[in-house]
């Protein structure tokens, strides 16, 4: 089959492998991008541990919190220029506050009343499209709550209070000092923003992702020519390393790399004054998994000139 240059370029961006290696990988896998990533990894050509999600939408992540809960929303716009617009920022801030009063489900947030308008959030977004003159949408929303303790928030690349390009929530359940729990939770939220863990615990890692890694590790280990019992131990070691990289509580704490998050929490309990547990986290990065339509500027100009 014919492999397009665009597909080769996309595989290179994901894996960092050479052009000919990418072309061969795509030819061997029938043009399947994800299978080509695995093919390169099995050959030891790609050093990518996981495929990075492409961030291609503009807009803002908005966070809002009260004593025992917090919410994250993503509102997309077509351009970054609009994301810097005061009216758009107010829209996102208000939607986050509305979401805090719901269960966090995006449909519930869209249907909820927008403050001071007598309209729904969905209607308020439509009004903003007409006023600002650019398409926009409430893409997603999520909420974390605790019965006792705190839900900490952190915004990376903040453009205004509670608004930015990456937003993180971390829930800490404890009978101890809620403010101390919130302070530690904020540090963990900063860590999550930086490391983007896949799951809170080993048990929560997608079994399909684990199976995929085991298959890749096994193929890599067999290329060493070592006996099967040694290969099993090699795979176990690599899988342990995989968990340390992608599971939040197993990760080295970016603020103090000598401690894992698990151990840092034990240390924080001294300040909190009671046992504490991280019960959940949410990380929203703007435009995660959404691809912007690319355009050829020269072709656009040529087309416009012919009109």
Curated annotation (Swiss-Prot):
Record has DNA damage as a keyword: no
Localization per record: Cytoplasm
Annotated InterPro entries: EF-Ts_dimer_sf, Transl_elong_EFTs/EF1B, Transl_elong_EFTs/EF1B_dimer, Transl_elong_Ts_CS, UBA-like_sf
Pfam families documented for this protein: EF_TS
Database matches in SUPFAM superfamilies: Elongation factor Ts (EF-Ts), dimerisation domain, UBA-like
One Gene Ontology molecular-function label: translation elongation factor activity
GO CC, alphabetical: cytoplasm
HAMAP family registered for this protein in UniProt: EF_Ts
Protein family: Belongs to the EF-Ts family.
Function summary: Associates with the EF-Tu.GDP complex and induces the exchange of GDP to GTP. It remains bound to the aminoacyl-tRNA.EF-Tu.GTP complex up to the GTP hydrolysis stage on the ribosome.
Database matches in NCBIfam families: tsf (TIGR00116)
Record protein name field: Elongation factor Ts
């Amino acid at each position: 089959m014919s492999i397009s240059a665009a597909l080769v370029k996309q595989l290179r961006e994901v894996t960092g492998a050479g052009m000919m290696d990418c072309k061969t990988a795509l030819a061997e896998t029938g043009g399947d991008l994800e299978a080509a990533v695995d093919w390169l990894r099995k050959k030891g050509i790609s050093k990518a541990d996981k495929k990075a999600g492409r961030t291609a939408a503009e807009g803002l992540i908005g966070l809002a919190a009260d004593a025992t809960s917090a919410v994250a929303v993503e509102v997309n716009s077509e351009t970054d220029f609009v994301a810097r617009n005061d009216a758009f920022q107010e829209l996102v801030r208000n939607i986050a506050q509305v979401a805090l009063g719901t269960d966090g489900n995006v449909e519930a947030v869209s249907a909820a009343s927008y403050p001071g308008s007598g309209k729904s959030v969905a209607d308020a977004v439509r009004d903003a499209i007409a006023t600002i003159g650019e398409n926009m949408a409430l893409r997603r929303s999520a909420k974390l709550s605790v019965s006792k303790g705190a839900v900490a928030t952190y915004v990376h690349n903040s453009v205004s209070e509670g608004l930015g390009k990456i937003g993180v929530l971390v829930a800490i359940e404890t009978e101890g000092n809620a403010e101390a729990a919130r302070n530690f939770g904020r540090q963990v939220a900063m860590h999550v923003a930086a490391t983007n863990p896949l799951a809170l615990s080993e048990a929560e890692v997608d079994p399909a992702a684990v199976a995929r890694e085991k298959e890749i590790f096994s193929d890599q280990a067999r290329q060493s020519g070592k006996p099967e019992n040694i290969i099993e131990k090699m795979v176990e070691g690599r899988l342990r390393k995989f968990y340390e990289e992608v599971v939040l509580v197993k990760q080295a704490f970016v603020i103090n790399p000598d401690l894992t998050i698990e151990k840092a929490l034990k240390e924080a309990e001294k300040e909190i004054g009671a046992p504490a547990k991280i019960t959940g986290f949410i990380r929203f990065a703007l435009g995660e998994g959404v691809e912007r339509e690319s355009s050829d500027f020269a072709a656009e100009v040529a087309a416009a000139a012919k009109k």
